[in-house]
Amino acid sequence: MKKFIFFFKNYCYISGSMLLFSLIDLLLWIISLYCVGLVFWILFVLQCIYFVWWLWKNIFYQLNSFGLVNFVWDNPLSVIIGKLGTGKTLLLTYLSQTMKLLTDEIYSNYPLEDDKVKVLTFKNLDFTDRTKPVPPDDSVILFDESYLYIDGTSPHDEKKVHSGKIPWIVLARHFGNRALFTAQREGMIWNNIRQLASGIIIPISLKKPVIKKGFNFFNRFFIMQIGIFQDITDYEIWKTKSVERTAEGKRVKHKSDVGLGIRFFKIIIPLEFANKYDSQWLKFVRDLKNDEIVNKKEYYWSEITKLSVKERLELFDIDILKKNLKPKKEKGNGKDD
């Protein structure tokens, strides 16, 4: 039943993304009712071409959605790597909805407007912690901004602090957990996770809905192209070759290779999924700092000339200048004049 509901919803999303073309096809059909001869057959052929295109696209996107769900389910550890704005959190949120096809145990470390998604922190995965439990069998764990929790650029230092997470990382598949971690660079992900990850997901491009007055009904979908790799080494090789082709002025190839476990495909993400999370939910951290500041006076640059040199130096807070321009203590004379 879940698969049928998922298929039907996906069908509606995909059909909705092509609604404008469907209206054009309907218009052609209405016109053809009043035409005869060559014009009728031309319109008939155009309708047939549209129908074949619509059917192929619908099947194409349906298979891609099912393929992504199965890929995540088959890999206990996956990482999503992409620069700022490529849609990493959007993809996690999309999976928070589509993975319900296989399980009801969904956890995330960032807020989602979904009553079925549970809160998770890094302590849930720490075996030295005795306050929060490890998620049960068949759980999907969505972990955004992993760099905020573990500094992947300092693996040796982090290993001392986060050694309690290693048992979970190694035994995730035995626990029936499926986890996804995001980062802007592969080097930002902790080495213990990166090397054991059997799923590498790369958001390559993201076509956002264009918000225009009167056309919002036709622009309620994101189209994301992603690449999936089964090993970090395969991804690094592909990335190196892509950089070389770009440097030579050539187009980067997004060609799937089933033998190497490399696939590229597109998925449609409804705008309603994107509205389930706040991309700036961590802005409360700013308030933690600002609430402790007593003097919150701000200056305009036009007011700087009214300050003394010493006040300017204190205001700009340039440590090197403050250190070197600090008045030296005068040495006292050894004997009276």
From Swiss-Prot:
Subcellular location, record wording: Host membrane
Gene3D superfamilies (UniProt xref): P-loop containing nucleotide triphosphate hydrolases (3.40.50.300)
Entry keywords, A to Z: Host membrane, Membrane, Transmembrane, Transmembrane helix
Membrane topology according to the record: Multi-pass membrane protein
Keyword Cell inner membrane: no
Residue ranges of the TM segments: 4-24, 26-46
One Gene Ontology cellular component annotation held by this UniProt entry: membrane
Family: Belongs to the plectrovirus ORF2 family.
Protein name as it appears in the record: Uncharacterized protein ORF2
